[in-house]
């Protein structure tokens, strides 16, 4: 039994699916050293995808040498002291809802200025939280589980606050995986159905 027509049909079906590739989006939140934005909200973009940040007071870019072993670079608040960081009782909310339409495979967050004894708190709108300690200072920490919970509840709001001491937001990084277009999936399905029919005919001959 010659199987080359079957193999050819299979190759055609697979060729209908575009090659998938991962994409990485990175948002860095300190682009200007020690400057207030003069507003409590701003949208940051990476490859055309926007994340909106809203502070409890005006946003502040901080960029200076480390203190107490902690990095002092990131997005903070203009109020209420000279540190210009997120203090207890203050917060910055990131809106990640623009990512819900993508096939997200990983989300990491980097906080800065977390000295010994200080903590940062990252929560969704449904009381699921991740705590950052001094060992996480200026390091990417996965919050993919938190993002999954946010997407499940259809709320993209992520609140960054200080548990103790004060913190800064350094970076958000997201990886996504391409999803085949619906038309490509239909073509693949049609090809596989045809392949199955050919196999049945060959076996019945």
What are these language model-derived features?
Residues 129-178:
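Terminal, low-complexity interaction segments
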Residues 22-89:
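N-terminal targeting leaders for non-cytosolic proteins
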Residues 116-128:
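Short, surface-exposed beta-strand/strand-loop-strand elements in extracellular ectodomains
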Residues 196-205:
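C-terminal membrane-anchoring or membrane-association module
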Residues 99-108:
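Extended extracellular/luminal ectodomain segments enriched in beta-structured repeat modules
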Residues 111-115, 162:
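Non-cytosolic beta-sheet module surface loops
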Residues 104, 114-117:
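Short proline/glycine-enriched turn/loop motifs at strand-loop junctions of beta-rich domains
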Residues 5-8, 15-23, 170-193:
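Short, threonine-centered small-residue motifs that mark membrane-proximal processing/anchoring sites
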């Amino acid at each position: 039994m010659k199987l080359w027509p079957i193999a050819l049909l299979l190759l055609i079906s697979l060729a209908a699916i575009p090659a998938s590739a991962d994409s990485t989006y990175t948002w860095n939140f300190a682009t200007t050293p020690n400057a207030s934005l003069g507003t409590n909200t701003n949208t940051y973009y990476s490859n055309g995808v926007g994340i909106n940040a809203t502070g409890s007071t005006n946003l502040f870019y901080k960029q200076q040498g480390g203190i107490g072993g902690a990095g002092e670079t990131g997005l903070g608040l203009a109020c209420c002291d000279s540190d210009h960081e997120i203090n207890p009782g203050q917060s910055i909310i990131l809106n990640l809802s623009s990512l819900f339409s993508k096939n997200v495979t990983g989300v990491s967050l980097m906080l800065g200025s977390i000295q010994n004894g200080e903590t940062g708190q990252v929560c969704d709108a449904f009381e699921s939280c991740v705590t950052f300690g001094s060992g996480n200072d200026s390091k990417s920490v996965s919050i993919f589980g938190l993002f999954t919970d946010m997407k499940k509840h259809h709320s993209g709001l992520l609140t960054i606050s200080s548990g103790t001491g004060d913190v800064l937001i350094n970076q958000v990084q997201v990886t996504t995986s391409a999803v085949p277009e619906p038309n490509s999936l239909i073509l693949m399905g049609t090809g596989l159905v045809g392949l199955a029919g050919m196999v049945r005919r060959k076996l019945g001959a």
